[in-house]
UniProtKB/Swiss-Prot annotation:
Origin species: Caenorhabditis elegans
Residues in compartment: Extracellular: 137-207
Similarity annotation: Belongs to the sodium:neurotransmitter symporter (SNF) family.
One GO CC term on file: neuron projection
Chief location: membrane
Topological type in the membrane: Multi-pass membrane protein
Protein location: Cell membrane
Tissues in which the protein is found: Highly expressed in the head, the excretory canal, tail hypodermal cells, epidermis and vulval epithelial cells. Expressed in the excretory canal-associated neuron and in some non-amphidial sensory neurons in the head (at protein level).
NCBIfam families the record matches: Na_transp
Ranges of Basic and acidic residues composition bias in the record: 12-30
Gene that encodes it: snf-3
Coiled-coil ranges per UniProt: none
One example GO MF annotation: amino-acid betaine transmembrane transporter activity
Name of the protein described by the UniProt record: Sodium- and chloride-dependent betaine transporter
Length: 600
């Protein structure tokens, strides 16, 4: 009889490790934040962006200064904070992206698709803005800025620098007027003729601006390598992109406040105008700015929250993030308007003649003021570096939100992450190519105005809030927060989620439709009819999927059920849902308890 070989029994530690591995094999590895501040920093990197630095200060001035701030704070309390907290909480609790989380309320799954479409629209053009900023940053490394003079090959006879004496300027204007034209500053000609090679017509592509093409390619490579191991592994990139812009903002703020005329700019920034509170345009601009700057409705917050551990204090992070976002906008306002006050002082013009809306504020106003600053090269490089970083970090987080939603819906993408991510980055790069043609800025304006903000965003956010508040259940969101971190919110938050937040987004959507104005060229002319029609098509892409999927669900699925039963199941009226993370925690506790008892 042969001797049998002794096989040692596995230790408790080995069993626990085996248990953990088996559970990970059942659920695909989504990746989790490992550091205490990873989630907070990722939200800062995502939500704090170009809208805070330039769009907020401009809108604040345009709409009455202090009056705009009052309205902004109202929307901040009624919509931004509640919806922000709602998205983060549900993402963490369900451990799903924007599409798959709606399996708990399938009638609203079209909302998740709408989130993905809006993110798709925004991702398509964000790297183009980054390319513009990088182009300016590179151009700033010169003793004389290329936009300072009219002696460049792209300048024509209508060019003025603003530094001519009165007699010379009058002569140039008279000469140009006699030819039926108008003068352009050297800054404007650099932007239109050198950076964009602008044809002035969205219909005339005119070829590719190859410098922007290659810079955009470099930007997409940065995005790819920041994400190829998953955003939870890109800690250094996230932290750098979240924190470094604040260094630059405070440098610009300190420098701006020490400039002559800064007080004039601050006064215009904060000047109260109570009569503007009755102006519907103020409410529309403040509301849309709140939704856009806090990044709700894109699915990215849900995705970032889904990478949290089940018991992570997402409530504290969400409230902190909302406070940081608001303070960043206000601080950036002081920095920007102190500099604009200096411009007003130097040019002896009213600020209303200096400030220009949209991308023009960043790429026309600042190059002009940088030319008159001491150590101009340093401040120009710092400013456009800040724009570049803010664009890249928002792009990375939006891409993560989109890719997480698609990975949850199609798990094979997670298995081949590097390859599939590369294909997606290449796809979006190709979509961006028309936006680096000679009419590219107009295509970007179209995507921004119709596809990624305004009507489409507000429409999707309305149904998202309704679906979460009534499908998932406002009381269940409050309960989920308590289960995860032990925080019990006041009962009143349920009424905010069920009534205030949906009403706010719906009213803003109606405002946008009622006060609709076709998109215009910078010179005030309307885009052609076909372009605005295409814009409405872009908007409809994210809107029609919501009722479209609901119709599909009610009439083409679960045919063995009655229509009433399908509605009941689609709205999850039975409240049957469970957090995968919570289930894993329970299973862990039960099986480890069994291991301990069996080993004794």
């Amino acid at each position: 009889m042969g001797t049998s070989e002794h096989v040692p029994l596995p230790t408790d530690e080995a069993k626990a490790k085996e248990l953990e591995q088996s559970q990970h094999s059942e659920e695909p590895d989504r990746g989790q934040w490992t550091g205490k501040f990873d989630f907070l920093m990722s939200m800062v990197a995502y939500a704090v962006g170009l809208g805070n630095v330039w769009r907020f200060p401009y809108l604040c001035y345009k709409n009455g200064g202090g009056s705009f701030l009052v309205v902004y704070m109202i929307f901040f309390c009624l919509a931004a904070v509640p919806i922000f907290l709602m998205e983060v909480t549900v993402g963490q609790y369900l451990q799903k992206g924007a599409m798959e989380m709606w399996l708990m309320c399938p009638l609203f799954r079209g909302v998740g698709i709408g989130n993905v479409v809006i993110a798709f629209m925004c991702i398509a053009y964000f790297c183009v803005i980054v390319a513009w900023a990088m182009f300016y940053m590179i151009s700033s490394i010169a003793w004389v800025f290329p936009w300072e003079t009219c002696n460049n090959y792209w300048n024509d006879a209508t060019c003025v620098t603003g530094k001519e004496n009165f007699t010379e300027l009058a002569r140039i204007k008279a000469l140009v007027a006699s030819a039926g034209g108008h003068t352009q500053t050297s800054v404007e000609q650099f932007w239109e003729k050198r950076v964009l090679h602008d044809t002035g017509d969205i219909s005339e592509f005119g070829g590719i601006q190859w410098e922007l093409f290659f810079i955009m390619a470099a930007a997409w490579l940065i995005v790819y390598f920041a994400l190829w191991k998953g955003i939870t592994q890109a800690r250094k990139f996230v932290y750098f992109c979240a924190l470094f812009p604040y260094v630059l903002i405070f440098i610009l703020l300190i420098r701006g406040l020490t400039l002559e005329g800064a007080g004039t700019g601050i006064y215009f920034y904060l000047k109260p105008n109570a009569t503007r509170l009755l102006d519907t345009a103020v409410w529309k601009d403040a509301g849309t700015q709140v939704f856009y700057s806090y990044g709700v409705g894109f699915g990215a917050l849900i995705a970032l929250g889904s990478h949290n551990k089940f018991n992570h204090n997402c409530f504290k992070d969400a409230i902190t993030m909302c406070f940081i976002n608001g303070c960043t906008s206000i601080t950036a306002g002081f920095a920007v308007f102190s500099i604009l006050g200096y411009m007003s002082h130097v040019a002896q013009k009213d600020i209303s003649e200096i400030v220009k809306p949209g991308v023009g504020l960043a790429f026309l106003a600042y190059p002009e003021v940088a030319s008159n600053l001491p150590m101009k090269q340093v401040f120009a490089v710092l400013f456009f570096l800040m724009i570049t970083i803010l664009g890249l970090d928002s792009q990375v987080c939006m891409m993560e939100g989109l890719f997480t939603a698609l990975e949850d819906a199609f798990p094979i993408l997670r298995k081949y992450k590097k390859q599939s991510l590369g294909i997606f980055c290449l796809f979006f790069f190709c979509i961006g190519i028309p936006m680096v043609t000679h009419s590219g800025s107009h295509w970007l304006t179209l995507f921004d105005a119709y596809g990624a903000s305004g009507y489409a965003l507000l429409f999707v956010v309305f149904f998202e809030v309704v679906g979460l508040a009534y499908g998932f259940g406002a009381h269940n969101i409050r309960k989920a927060l308590h289960e995860m971190i032990g925080v019990t919110l006041p009962k009143g938050i349920e009424y905010v989620w069920k009534f205030c937040a949906p009403a706010t987004s719906l009213v803003l959507f109606v405002f946008c439709v009622v006060y609709y104005h076709p998109v215009k060229y910078p010179d005030g002319k309307d885009f052609p009819f076909w372009a605005n029609a295409f814009g409405w098509f872009l908007s409809s892409c994210s809107m029609v999927v919501i009722p479209g999927y609901a119709i599909y669900y009610l009439f083409f699925t679960n045919k063995h059920l009655t229509l009433k039963e399908r509605v009941r199941k689609g709205l999850n009226l039975d409240g049957s849902f469970e957090s995968p993370a919570k289930k894993n925690l329970v299973n862990n506790a039960e099986e480890l308890k069994f291991i301990e008892s069996s080993s004794q």
